[in-house]
Amino acid sequence: MLQISHLYKNYGKFQAVRDLNLHVPKGDLFGFVGPNGAGKTTTIRMVCGLMPPTEGTITIHGVDALLHPKEIKKQIGYVPDFFGVYDNLKVSEYMDFYGSMYRMTSREITAVSNDLLELVNLSDKKEVYVDTLSRGMKQRLCVARALIHNPSLLVLDEPNSGLDPRARVEMKELLQNLRSMGKTIVISSHILSELAEMCNSIGIMDHGKLVEAGNIEDVMEHVFGGNRIVVSVHGEMEPAVRMLKEHPQIKVESVGEKEIHISHAMKEEEIAQLIAQMIQNGIIVTGFYKEEGN
């Protein structure tokens, strides 16, 4: 489906993406994960034809994205990491506007929009102005807009950014539903645990390199296997759990009454820095230790 070979993106002497190779089969829900500046957004923008690579090839369904950009854009639905929503339009007008960009007839737009708004659970918001929607609703509307021309590949850059927990769950369920319908999906996030809950395959990026990619279970075991610690916390657990879950190199395995069991892909000094940061944020860490058998 999506094939990336020896992809580079240079800005002068700085390499934002370095020798990236990736294959995403049809029907996969693939997630790029990594810290800010890892190269996720740059890679996604190159896949979507929004910036040219310095070197390398991108093919979708065997079509070279660099040689046939117009054909490729018909195959891609893109949701950027900002809303790009016209707040002064009603939801129905917003869908009409984007449908017209693909030269769909009014009848086609109405039929497709009705189906898509039902899919993203916004059927009752058709005559509501976009600026009255919640952040989560706006994000789901962006997904509906990206699907209006029935693309074979849906690409989302940080789709859960800024969403509350309920909206994150709704987005996860929507993407999993789309995958069950046969869509191939590529998303990015800096939160590993988030991708682990929705993707069937992931790629870990760091400093422009794809350092690990494959089946979610295999990647998690390879990256985190054998690196397990327990963090003891006094008082409220939620801030500590949230902070650990948002770290790109940590997977929260379980949460007890006073202990958080995590897997990690960090050096000892990085663990110490993380614990110090937790304490600076007002979290009372009473200790941390390696689990037995590690």
Residue ranges of each PLM-predicted region?
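Conserved ABC transporter NBD signature motif
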Residues: 56-64, 71-72
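Conserved ABC ATPase "signature" region
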Residues: 96, 100, 107-125
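Conserved ABC ATPase signature
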Residues: 129-133
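Conserved catalytic motifs of ABC-family nucleotide-binding domains
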Residues: 150
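Catalytic Walker B motif of ABC-type/P-loop ATPase nucleotide-binding domains
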Residues: 154-157
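ABC transporter nucleotide-binding domain
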Residues: 172-263
